Amino acid sequence: MEIILLLFLLQIKHCYADFVIQTYKQTVHKGIYRDPIGISHSVDHVWTSMIALLVFSFFYAINPFTIIWLCFAEGILHYHIDFVKVKFGSKDQTKPIFWAQFGLDQLAHQVTYLVMAIFLLNL
């Protein structure tokens, strides 16, 4: 049951960071490596992951340092997944390849959350 709660919290935070608070500028600048505006989107994922894991830690003990480094690792990975998609992916939303690449991007993020959950539940 723990994994369901953890994945649920990570899904909520992902939806919020990717689809609610992400700005147009962030979507464009994610394709410029080390651009502060593009990086800010990944920072949004770091702090929303921290909140999700802090909520989870009310029910299941997690070392605070583990939360910090795991969230920063997720932010770095999120940044690079998005960079590759924006830099090398299709920009034309009318083409099926755009949506296939968008789906692969989202799958990569979901696999990241699954790995995070498996790691945390096997400490």
Role assignments for model-derived ranges:
Residues 1-90, 94-95, 99-123:
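Hydrophobic alpha-helical transmembrane segments
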